[in-house]
Amino acid sequence: MREIKKGDIVSRNSYKNDIMFEVKKILKLVDDRKIAILRGIDVRVEADAPIEDLKLVSKEERIRREKEFEEKIINRIAKIENIEHSRRKEIIYTGKILHLDGDKKYAEKSIMYYKKMGLNAIVKNIPENRQAKVVYRLLSIYNPDILVITGHDGMISNKQKYNDVLNYRNSIHFIKTVKEARIYDEKHGKKLVIFAGACQSYFEALMDAGADFASSPARILIDFLDPLVVAKNVAVTDKRKYITIDDFVDELRDGKRGVNGLGAQGKKNVIFL
């Protein structure tokens, strides 16, 4: 097998090669061992692994898995019930979404999802560690009703250190971004609905920071689509209705174990002519 390098698509032998990753960087330790920093291809997880634990994914296997991923997105969209509108003439304004994504490929796929759902969404590929620095300005520019803060995350080592923010790869950046968004919100009285988090994110701290929905209560992996499902449901729910996870729990990969929250007021506005 050739030497693994940045940009390669790999899986981890120690995890039975269950998840496909892209190698983002390779670190050389003082004892000459090499550690790869990995980002999930179809789940929002960031991880690391010794080079010797990695297996290169063949082109055929990669194409097969990517096809399965695309089909999963299409199937998830197809399962969403069609909303029956009143026979009266009406103008429907769904909530406007601003989506910040730390992963470029996920950002591109998110645009596709929102378009297929007919939603008004702006998607920006912003690295997790820069999201807090730009969110206030972006909120000022786009004035959304719903904010999605996501990308990749993961617990670093001891799975028992649930309450140590330093044991999470990107939760601290998501937390800072939520706080910045709430500063904007309080100043402008927008009543912004916020989803924040990715795989294994520090759920409690994200909620304390001001998120309405967040991941991951059980510190499990979440699906690429889970943040988008939350945003979509808030966007298409009438502004007179309060929406909770129970209203769309079946659309989430692992239900309340992956995503939960306090709920929020819907953002759809219907004007009858």
Regions found by a protein language model. Name each.
Residues 2-5:
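Short, well-ordered loop/turn sites that connect or cap secondary structure elements
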Residues 17-28:
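Short beta-strand-centered aromatic/proline hotspots
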Residues 29-39:
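Short, solvent-exposed secondary-structure boundary/capping segments
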Residues 41-88:
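Intrinsically disordered, low-complexity, charged/polar segments
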Residues 111-122:
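Short helix-loop-beta junction
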Residues 139-153, 211:
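Proline-aspartate-enriched helix->loop->beta-strand connector
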Residues 176-222:
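Catalytic cores of nucleophile-dependent amide-cleaving enzymes
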Residues 218-273:
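C-terminal functional extensions of proteins
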